[in-house]
């Protein structure tokens, strides 16, 4: 609340607002660099969207709305996290978990042991929920976990965490906020704050056109999946909790590989080393792990140096799922680059993911999709960390419209489909353990999944497997586009 109050008061500071207005209308404004002109323009925009032009009475109401929205946003996230963490299953019969990969079972067994329970522990966190949806042969288990997942923090669960009324309050307050600022709706407010799109109608027209083009392909994909589920899996109906499971089976049929086979070639140490080597070649930088106080033992901290050995950025990497973390993957700024008192303030970023942690004595193994996610978020990080702009308000990700900020991150994803990159960032986990690359611990007695080909002597992913992945790149792309 205090932070929200500070930002609300700052956005309505009449003295500062008037100073920026005077500067914008002066001859001196046109003598500023384009970067500094952009800072002034952005500040004036933010003052207006913060209620600086409102009457005294409306300013007070606007500030109340801001503080109440902040409280509701926080409560919404807390409810979702609490509802997610409230669910846990402890199966004790191995046959109930048929189809689940060995590394998932290892992690589930360790989680149950930590709770002092026998068997395995399954939760709604991504490292458990997603493999159950994709691999579990037990349809009843898939249905139970799916229904629980999609009804979290709703009227269908524990009323203590029901977000239904919060959503209504948020929508009403946003609408009132928009009207106070002179807009017809909150969508217009959102677009006015640093977006390329000019109107909600422009956005809706784009989405409708995209949906129109993608829908026939999605319908074809879904019909193909339904036919396969009926003929091959003997499912009378294709329910929501069957889609990921049936899709994995269908892809295996078409392309003769599975995510689990691919996963064996992406142990975390090798993936990070390959990622860092790539960006070092691309940008002439050097990334080094270093020690610093962190909020959890899993968190790593890195320095970035330029070709001359000068420190230019730092970042935290918090890659594993935990009960205290919100879901998904994201990059956020801790410190932005700026020039102050003749010296440059070094930018610092947070890189957050929710990947499976190491289990069974083995390093963490990433799916190819998780590798893409890592590259995506690191692209955001590079955008923030390698900026040369030295004005705080527009350095790094702050200087780009929100509907364009995904460009650097999606650009980085492309490298995950390049053989010259992938062959240097893959190594079979058995080879990694044997050679202790990157300090991975050596273990034994854990069976590997069935593979279509043995790993090469150096352990890199076989080219034939990569070619299969490339062939399957657009598998169900119609469904994915419509879902997105």
Where are the language model's segments positioned?
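Noncatalytic, helix-rich "gating/capping" subdomain that lines the substrate-entry/channel surface
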Residues: 1-189, 274, 310
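Alpha-helix N-cap/helix-initiation motif
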Residues: 159, 163, 264, 268, ...
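The catalytic-center signature of Zn2+-dependent metalloproteases
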Residues: 387-413, 417
């Amino acid at each position: 609340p205090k932070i929200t109050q500070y930002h609300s008061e700052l956005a309505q500071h009449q003295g500062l607002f008037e100073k920026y207005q005077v500067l914008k209308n002066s001859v001196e404004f046109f003598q500023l660099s384009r970067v500094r002109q952009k800072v002034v323009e952005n500040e004036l925009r933010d003052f207006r969207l913060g209620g600086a032009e409102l009457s005294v009475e409306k300013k007070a109401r606007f500030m109340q709305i801001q503080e109440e929205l902040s409280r509701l946003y926080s409560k919404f996230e807390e409810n979702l996290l609490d509802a997610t963490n409230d669910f846990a299953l402890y199966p004790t019969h191995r046959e109930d978990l048929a189809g689940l990969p060995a590394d998932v079972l290892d992690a589930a067994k360790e989680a149950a042991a930590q709770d002092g329970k026998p068997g395995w522990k399954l939760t709604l966190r991504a490292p458990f929920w997603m493999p159950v949806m994709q691999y579990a042969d037990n349809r009843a288990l898939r249905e139970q976990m799916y229904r629980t997942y999609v009804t979290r923090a709703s009227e269908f669960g524990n009323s203590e965490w029901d977000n239904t009324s919060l959503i209504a309050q948020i929508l009403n307050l946003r609408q009132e906020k928009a009207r106070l600022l002179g807009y017809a709706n909150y969508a217009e407010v959102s677009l006015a704050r640093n977006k390329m799109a000019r109107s909600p109608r422009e956005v809706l027209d784009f989405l409708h056109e995209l949906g129109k083009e993608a829908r026939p392909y999605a319908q074809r994909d879904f019909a193909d999946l339904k036919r396969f589920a009926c003929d091959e899996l003997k499912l009378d109906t294709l329910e929501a909790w069957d889609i990921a499971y049936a899709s994995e089976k269908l892809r295996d049929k078409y392309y003769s590989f599975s995510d689990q086979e691919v996963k064996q070639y992406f142990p975390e140490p090798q993936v990070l080393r390959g990622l860092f080597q790539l960006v070092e070649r691309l940008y002439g930088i050097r990334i080094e792990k270093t020690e610093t106080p962190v909020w959890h033992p899993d968190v790593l901290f890195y320095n970035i140096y330029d070709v001359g050995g000068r420190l230019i950025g730092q970042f935290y990497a918090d890659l594993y799922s935990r009960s205290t973390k919100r879901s998904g993957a994201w990059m956020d700024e801790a410190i932005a680059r700026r020039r102050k008192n003749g010296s440059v303030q070094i930018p610092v970023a947070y890189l957050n993911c929710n990947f499976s942690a190491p289990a069974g004595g083995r390093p963490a193994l990433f799916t190819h999709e998780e590798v893409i996610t890592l590259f995506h978020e690191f692209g955001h990080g590079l955008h923030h960390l390698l900026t040369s702009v030295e004005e705080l308000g527009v350095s790094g990700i702050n200087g780009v419209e929100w509907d364009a900020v995904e460009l650097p991150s999606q650009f980085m994803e492309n490298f995950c489909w390049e053989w010259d990159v992938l062959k240097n960032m893959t190594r079979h986990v058995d080879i990694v353990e044997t050679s202790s690359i990157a300090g991975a611990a050596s273990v034994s007695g854990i069976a590997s999944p069935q593979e279509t080909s043995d790993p090469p002597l150096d352990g890199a992913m076989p080219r034939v497997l990569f070619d299969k992945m490339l062939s399957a790149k657009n598998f169900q792309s119609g469904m994915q586009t419509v879902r997105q």
